[in-house]
Amino acid sequence: MQKWIVEDWEFIIKVIEGEAKHCRLGFEKGDVFTCQYEVPTGFCPKTMATVHTLCEIVRCGGSFKLRGSDKEYEIDFPCADGCIYFHLVARPINQ
């Protein structure tokens, strides 16, 4: 595979609340995932739909403030099952 697009954003997803015993994948507070456009290795496929939507907001020039966040490029959100809470940070790169 030959990637031909240079991405403009990097996303850091950190588990901020939850216990491994409540998550099928064993996520717990402090776990961190990083990605650009691809799915982060080992990340929850059910929650990825939410992550993709949030990432597209930023890629299209939007802001998380319109989704209720106090910060333009940071937002907290629950997993698809509501057991784990994440903090997403969008960081510009290659700009």
Show the residue positions of the predicted features.
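Short, basic/aromatic beta-hairpin or loop at an interaction surface
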Residues: 2-14
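N-terminal first-folded block
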Residues: 13-23
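Short, charged beta-turn/beta-strand-edge "cap" motif at the junction between a beta-strand
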Residues: 18-20, 37-43
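Short, compositionally biased
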Residues: 45-62
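Short, compact, well-ordered microdomains
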Residues: 62-95
